[in-house]
């Protein structure tokens, strides 16, 4: 097994599917099955899910709002997605714990690092909601932070494309693909792998990032088995 402990970062838009907003039940179930398959192989899986399918603090909808208030709304959106994903996993028989950076005791545990690690060691999937609990930080940064805190072997960013390109392959068919690329090159080329705070955190803690297509069935399991999937961002 190439990676035993993984933090999977999914965008909220991924859960929306072709609808572009809200939660698509088919996409939710598909991603939950991918996570279950990886967990059943013996991997320890944690997740961070964005909230852009419901609300994004830097979106047009929030342009006249106070940024802090808008970001808190975005954090709540991530919790909605996290609860939905927890439910999807538990319907598949996967024990799942939701931990949030903001206390919501009726529906989630508070984030406690040692408890999260213990859950993972017991074979439970752990979902981290509400970002970092602080405004001005993205869920990419939250994913990097949590991955470092739980001592993950890798952070996997699930996207709609096959990995890292020099431009958007959905609009530029001749975009150059990078099977491997360094953190510094990502920063120098200003590639939209993750935001710069997240990339810098990973670089400073030598946490590798794999960017891959989560719409490709079985990709997560192939990665765990040691097959080359997507793009590797490394030192």
Curated annotation (Swiss-Prot):
Record CDD domains: AAK_UMPK-PyrH-Ec
Single annotated GO MF: UMP kinase activity
Any one GO BP annotation for this protein: 'de novo' CTP biosynthetic process
Protein name in the entry: Uridylate kinase
Pathway where it operates: Pyrimidine metabolism; CTP biosynthesis via de novo pathway; UDP from UMP (UMPK route): step 1/1
InterPro entries referenced in this protein's UniProt entry, alphabetically: AceGlu_kinase-like_sf, Asp/Glu/Uridylate_kinase, Uridylate_kinase, Uridylate_kinase_bac
Family per similarity comment: Belongs to the UMP kinase family.
Record field: catalytic activity: UMP + ATP = UDP + ADP
A single cellular component GO annotation: cytoplasm
């Amino acid at each position: 097994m190439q990676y035993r402990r993984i933090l999977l970062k999914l965008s909220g838009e991924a859960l929306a599917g072709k609808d572009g907003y809200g939660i698509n039940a088919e996409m939710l179930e598909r991603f939950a099955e991918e996570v279950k398959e990886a967990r059943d192989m013996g991997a320890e899986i944690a997740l961070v899910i964005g909230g852009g399918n419901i609300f994004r603090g830097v979106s047009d909808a929030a342009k006249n709002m106070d940024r802090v208030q808008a970001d808190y709304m975005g954090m709540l959106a991530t919790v909605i997605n996290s609860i939905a994903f927890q439910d999807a996993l538990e319907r598949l028989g996967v024990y799942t714990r939701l931990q949030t950076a903001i206390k919501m005791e009726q529906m989630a545990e508070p984030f406690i690092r040692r408890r999260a690690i213990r859950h993972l060691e017991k074979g439970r999937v752990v979902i981290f909601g509400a970002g970092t609990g602080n405004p001005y930080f993205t869920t990419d940064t939250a994913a990097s932070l949590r991955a470092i805190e739980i001592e993950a072997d890798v952070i996997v960013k699930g996207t709609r494309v096959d990995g890292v390109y020099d431009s958007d392959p959905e609009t530029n068919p001749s975009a150059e693909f990078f099977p491997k690329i360094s953190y510094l090159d990502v920063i120098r080329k200003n590639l939209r792998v993750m935001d710069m705070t997240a990339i810098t955190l990973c670089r400073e803690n030598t946490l590798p990032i794999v960017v891959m297509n989560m719409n490709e069935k079985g990709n997560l399991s192939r990665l765990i088995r040691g097959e080359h999937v997507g793009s590797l961002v490394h030192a």
